[in-house]
A protein has these predicted regions:
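Alpha-helical structural modules in large enzymes and assemblies
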Residues: 1-578
Length: 578
C-alpha cells in the first residue's frame, strides 16, 4: 500500500476500526530515520486529525454562510467519561436551494449557565466568521435536564438578534418533554420510578409474564360469566404490562394504561410472589411493589397522569407524522392547551370520583380529606404549613402537575411561534398550492422578518407572488411538488429564482427554522462510536475533531492526500521532509 493510500485509509475509516493501524504507523521515510517515525505515532494523531478538521464544515461551508441566514441547533448528552457534551449544528439553505445541517463542534459544558453557554457558542461562530445577527432560528434539546439554561440561552440570543425565533423541533419526542416537566413535581417523579420498578418485577421473567396473562384470562372469563363485560371483535384482549422507555413513542402513556388494565392481575401475581417467591429478595421486592400499588397516592397519580397524557397524546402523535400538516398541528396545540386548562378549572371532582370508585373496587384505603396531611419520611421535618389531605392532593399534586404541563406547552409553542408556523404554511406547495395565500406571506414578512426586506422589496414581494401564483399552474417542475424544501430547490433548478428572488428569500428564511431535524441525535450516536469505554480518556478537542471528520464524511472525502500532508507539515519544522 502506498504512503498516500495509507493516509487516505486512515481518514476515511471509522474511528473504531483497527484494521489499518499497523499500516498507518508505518507511513514514514526510510527506517534509518527513527525520529521521523514519531510523526505518525498515536501521540501525533490529535494534531493530524485537528489539521483535517480545521477545514471541515469549516471545509469551506462558512464562506458560503458569511452573509446567509442560519439557525443554531443545540443539544446535550453525556459521553463515556460522564462529561456533559454540547453539540452545535448549523442549519442553512445552500446556493442550490437545499437544506443543509452541518455539525460544527462539540463543547464540554464545565459551567453550564446561560451566559457561559452563549459565550461558548458565540466563540464557535466567530471562529468561522459567522455573525450572530444572521441567526434566524434556535432549536434546543427536546428533553433536557438543562431546561432552565436553554430558556435563558434562548432569551440571550433574542437580545442580540430579535428574529432568532425558537421553534420546537417536531423530531424531538414532545411526550418525553412533557413527562420531564411533570417530573419536576417530586411525587410524580417518584411515581414514574415506582411504575418502572413494578413493571420490571412483572416482566423480568417469562414465568411471571405467563402467570400474569393466565390471571387476566381467568378474570375476563369470570366477568363474562356474570355479564359485566360486552363481547365483540377486538374487545377484552389479554395484554401485558408495557415498559416505560425514553425513546419509544407514547411509552409512558401506554405503560400507565396497561397497568390500569392489568391492575387486579398484577396484584394477584405479586401476592403469589410474596407467599411463594424463590428468594427473600424477590419476596421483599414484591411486597414493596404491592404496598406501592395499593396506596391511595399512587392510584391518584396513576389516573391523573392517564388523563393528562391522554389529552396530550393526540398532539404528540400528530407531531411525529412523516407528512406534516402545520396548520392542523397548531390547531391541535390550541385544543390541547384548552383541554389541559379545563382540567384545572373543573377536572378535579370528576377525577376524584373515578379514583374513589377504583379504590372501592380494589379495597384500597381512602384517607379522610379533611384530616391534616403530614409529609412522609425526610420531608416531614421541612413541612412548615399545616394542610389537609385535600389541599395536598388537589393543589400540591393535581394543580401543580397541570401547571407544569401548561408551562412546557407554552414555552415550546408560544403564540408568536404558532403564528409564525401557521403563516409559513401559506408557502406549502402540497395539493397544488392549496394553502398558498399572498396576504399571509406578506404578513409573515412584515411581522417576523422586517429587517430582511426593505420597504420597496416588501411592496415588490406582493407583485412577485401574484405572478408566481399564475406561473406555477403551467410549470410542471413547480406544480408537482409537495414540500417547501422541494419548492426551494425547484426555483433554483428551473432558474425561476431570478424572477422570484424575493419569494426565494422568504422560503430560505422559513427553511432555516428547525421544525424537523435529527442531526444532533446523529452527533451523539457518533460520539458513542468514537469515545468508547476503551477510549474514555480522549480529550474534548480530539473528540470534537474526530467527530467533525466522522459525521461530515462527504466533505472529508474531498480532501486529497497531498493537502493533508501539506497541512500536517505546516504544524512545525520536521527533521525530514514528508
Amino acid at each position: 500500500m502506498s504512503k498516500h493510500k495509507k493516509i487516505d485509509s486512515y481518514f476515511k475509516r471509522k474511528p473504531s476500526d483497527k484494521d489499518n493501524e499497523d499500516d498507518i504507523a508505518s507511513i514514514s521515510l526510510p527506517q534509518q530515520n527513527s525520529s521521523f517515525g514519531q510523526v505518525v505515532q498515536p501521540d501525533q494523531q490529535p494534531s493530524k486529525v485537528q489539521k483535517v478538521s480545521i477545514g471541515e464544515p469549516s471545509i469551506g461551508e462558512p464562506s458560503k454562510l458569511n452573509s446567509s441566514k442560519f439557525c443554531i441547533v443545540i443539544d446535550e448528552s453525556c459521553d463515556e467519561s460522564q462529561r456533559e457534551q454540547m453539540a452545535i449544528v448549523l442549519r442553512f439553505v445552500d446556493k442550490n436551494g437545499y437544506i443543509q445541517e452541518r455539525f460544527f463542534d462539540i463543547l464540554h459544558g464545565k459551567d453550564p449557565t446561560s451566559i457561559t453557554l452563549k459565550k461558548a457558542i458565540c466563540g464557535v461562530l466567530s471562529q468561522h466568521n459567522l455573525d450572530v445577527s444572521n441567526i434566524r432560528g434556535q432549536g434546543y434539546d427536546g428533553v433536557s435536564n438543562m431546561r432552565g439554561e436553554w430558556n435563558g440561552l434562548h432569551a440571550l440570543f433574542l437580545k442580540d438578534c430579535s428574529h432568532a425565533y425558537y421553534v420546537h423541533c417536531f423530531a424531538h419526542r414532545l411526550q418525553l418533554a412533557l413527562v420531564a416537566a411533570s417530573r419536576e413535581v417530586i411525587v410524580v417523579h417518584e411515581f414514574f420510578s415506582k411504575l418502572t420498578f413494578i413493571v420490571n418485577i412483572m416482566c423480568s421473567s417469562s414465568k411471571r409474564h405467563d402467570e400474569l396473562q393466565a390471571v387476566k384470562s381467568a378474570e375476563l372469563e369470570h366477568l363474562l360469566e356474570i355479564d359485566e363485560l360486552i363481547t365483540s371483535k377486538g374487545e377484552n384482549q389479554i395484554g401485558t404490562l408495557k415498559r416505560v422507555g425514553d425513546t419509544r413513542w407514547s411509552s409512558h402513556f401506554s405503560s400507565i394504561c396497561s397497568l390500569i388494565n392489568m391492575y387486579n392481575a398484577t396484584c394477584v401475581v405479586l401476592l403469589k410472589i410474596i407467599d411463594n417467591g424463590s428468594s427473600s429478595l424477590k419476596r421483599v421486592d414484591a411486597d414493596v411493589a404491592y404496598n406501592t400499588m395499593t396506596s391511595f397516592e399512587f392510584i391518584l397519580i396513576l389516573h391523573m397522569m392517564k388523563e393528562i397524557m391522554g389529552i396530550t397524546d393526540c398532539l404528540c402523535q400528530a407531531l411525529q407524522l412523516k407528512s406534516q400538516d402545520i396548520v392542523n398541528a397548531m390547531q391541535l396545540v390550541r385544543t390541547t392547551k384548552e383541554l389541559i386548562q379545563k382540567l384545572t378549572d373543573g377536572g378535579w371532582q370528576s377525577l376524584l370520583k373515578t379514583i374513589t370508585l377504583f379504590c372501592e373496587q380494589h379495597d384500597i384505603y381512602i384517607p379522610d380529606f379533611n384530616n391534616a396531611y403530614i409529609a412522609r419520611e425526610g420531608r416531614a421535618r421541612h413541612q412548615k404549613d399545616h394542610i389537609t389531605f385535600e389541599h395536598h392532593y388537589r393543589v400540591n399534586i393535581f394543580l401543580t402537575t397541570i401547571d407544569k404541563q401548561l408551562q412546557e406547552l407554552n414555552r415550546r409553542f408560544s403564540e408568536q411561534t404558532m403564528e409564525l408556523l401557521t403563516l409559513s404554511a401559506s408557502l406549502d406547495p402540497k395539493d397544488v398550492y392549496k394553502t398558498f395565500n399572498i396576504d399571509n406571506i406578506c404578513i409573515l414578512v412584515q411581522k417576523f422578518y422586517p429587517m430582511d426586506f426593505n420597504d420597496q422589496e416588501k411592496i415588490n414581494l406582493r407583485y412577485q407572488l401574484q405572478h408566481f401564483s399564475l406561473d406555477v399552474v403551467s410549470h410542471s417542475d413547480l406544480k408537482n411538488i409537495s414540500t417547501i424544501s422541494e419548492l426551494s430547490a425547484a426555483l433554483t433548478k428551473t432558474g425561476k429564482v431570478n424572477a422570484y428572488y424575493l419569494l426565494d428569500r422568504v422560503i430560505r428564511l422559513i427553511l432555516t427554522l428547525p421544525v424537523s431535524t435529527a442531526t444532533t441525535e446523529r452527533s451523539f450516536s457518533a460520539m458513542k462510536i468514537i469515545k468508547t469505554r476503551l477510549r474514555s480518556k480522549m480529550e474534548d478537542e480530539f473528540l470534537a475533531d474526530n467527530m467533525v471528520i466522522y459525521i461530515e464524511k462527504e466533505i472529508a472525502e474531498t480532501f486529497t492526500s497531498d493537502s493533508i500532508i501539506d497541512e500536517f507539515k505546516s504544524l512545525k519544522e520536521r527533521r525530514a521532509a514528508l
